[in-house]
Curated annotation (Swiss-Prot):
Domain of life of the organism encoding this protein: Bacteria
Note: The cell wall polysaccharides of some oral streptococci act as receptors for the lectin-like surface adhesins on other members of the oral biofilm community, especially type 2 fimbriated strains of Actinomyces naeslundii, allowing colonization of the human tooth surface. Recognition of these receptor polysaccharides (RPS) depends on the presence of a host-like motif, either GalNAc beta 1-3Gal (Gn) or Gal beta 1-3GalNAc (G), within the oligosaccharide repeating units of different RPS structural types. Stealth proteins are part of a protein family that is conserved from bacteria to higher eukaryotes. Family members were first identified in microbes as proteins that help pathogens to elude the host innate immune system. Microbial stealth proteins are involved in the biosynthesis of exopolysaccharides. Stealth proteins are predicted to function as hexose-1-phosphoryltransferases.
TM stretches of this protein: none
Pfam family, one: Stealth_CR2
Family: Belongs to the stealth family.
UniProt-listed Enzyme Commission number(s): 2.7.-.-
Molecular function per GO: transferase activity, transferring phosphorus-containing groups
Keyword Signal assigned: no
Signal peptide stretch: none
Key words of the record: Exopolysaccharide synthesis, Transferase
Key word Phosphoprotein present: no
Group of enzyme by EC: transferase
Name used for this protein in its record: Receptor polysaccharide phosphotransferase WefC
Length: 333
């Protein structure tokens, strides 16, 4: 049984004028192709981050430490004296030569450098909310392996999407593991992943090459030692990502470390019903009811790029979260 599990979450306040001025000094380095990958929506702050902390305190009180990774920022409501909270600045984990960075990819690639971080930790994006009780066994097996639901699936090729990063991640994986090794190690042909994922694997397992891994967009249980290992084997690539001030098609991302666990067989199969990915593009009365229903323990609520009435959606989002998590957490002033 894993004794200590930490949570790590990265956050940026895109409304902060000091941060915006700093970013503006480097915006000229963004070429036309990269503009779509680094739009204002990538940094938008909806004012819902306090509910992330409320969810953790209510639904995962067993967590050891929470490491909040920021760029010299902190939410105005945050109690920095909270016993479980540790603020981590980018300067503590990323080489000064590469700073400042305005992309999640360099940050995610260096989170294992957080001073004091436990071997077993779960990395969250700030749009991944706990919405019902979770236990350590939801993230790690009794013998300490990270738990994932996966499948063989093609990589989605959107011009400004994450497919570029996933292609780079998988290129590294397939350079270290053969198709035979991946299929033998990966536990893909198991009903435990869920019937939908098994069907994907059966469809794409017959191709000549590994086409990609299905991505759940849920929090990432990771091992610090695995990140060290991948850095040891792919230092040049990861240094390039670390030096990428803005999102670039040449980047890798945090999925690389998860994929390494899968390809090497160093993972256990998770619960396919643990959570889901949702977009605010489709937010309406039914979605807000779902958020409060307890059907999912974890919900990744993505900002989306086609929200029609942003002000109304933001109001409804905050209202729904306040219904689910009305009480202040110990992390709030």
């Amino acid at each position: 049984m894993v004794e200590k599990i930490d949570f790590v979450v990265a956050w940026v306040d895109g409304n902060d004028l000091v941060w915006r001025e700093k970013k503006a000094q480097y915006d000229g380095s963004i070429n036309t192709f990269k503009e779509g990958m680094n739009s204002e929506k990538s940094y938008r702050e909806w004012g819902t981050f306090k509910y992330w902390f409320r969810g953790v305190e209510k639904f995962a009180p067993w967590v050891n430490k929470i490491y909040l990774v920021t760029d010299q920022q902190k939410p105005s409501w945050l109690d920095i004296n909270s016993e479980k909270l540790v603020l981590v600045d980018h300067t503590e984990i990323i080489c000064n030569d590469y700073l400042p960075v305005f992309s999640a990819n360099p940050i995610e690639s260096n989170i294992h450098r957080i001073p004091g971080l436990s071997e077993h930790f779960v990395f969250f994006n700030d749009d991944m909310y706990l919405t019902a009780p979770v236990e350590p066994i939801d993230f790690f097996s009794e013998d300490g392996l990270p738990k994932y639901v996966t499948a063989l699936a093609p990589i989605t090729t959107e011009r400004y999407g994450t497919g570029h990063f996933q292609m780079n991640d998988m290129g590294i994986i397939t350079s270290h593991f053969s198709k035979k090794e991946i299929l033998n190690n990966g536990h893909f042909f198991s009903f435990k992943h869920g019937i939908k994922q098994l069907i994907k694997t059966l469809l794409y397992g017959t191709t000549k090459f590994i086409c990609g891994f299905w991505e759940s967009h849920l929090p990432y249980p990771l091992l610090k030692s695995t990140m060290d290992l991948v850095w040891e084997k792919e230092k040049a690539v990861l240094e390039t990502t670390s030096a990428s001030r803005f999102r670039s098609p040449s980047d890798t991302n945090v999925w690389l470390f998860k994929y390494w666990q899968i390809a090497s067989g160093q993972y256990a199969i998770g619960n396919p019903k643990l959570g889901g990915l949702f977009s605010l593009d489709n937010a309406g009365p039914d979605f807000w009811k779902l958020l409060n229903s307890g059907k999912y323990q974890i919900m990744c609520i993505n900002d989306g790029h086609n929200v029609q009435d942003e002000e109304q959606v933001m109001t409804d989002f905050v209202k729904a979260m306040d219904q689910l998590l009305p009480d202040k957490s110990s992390f709030e002033i």
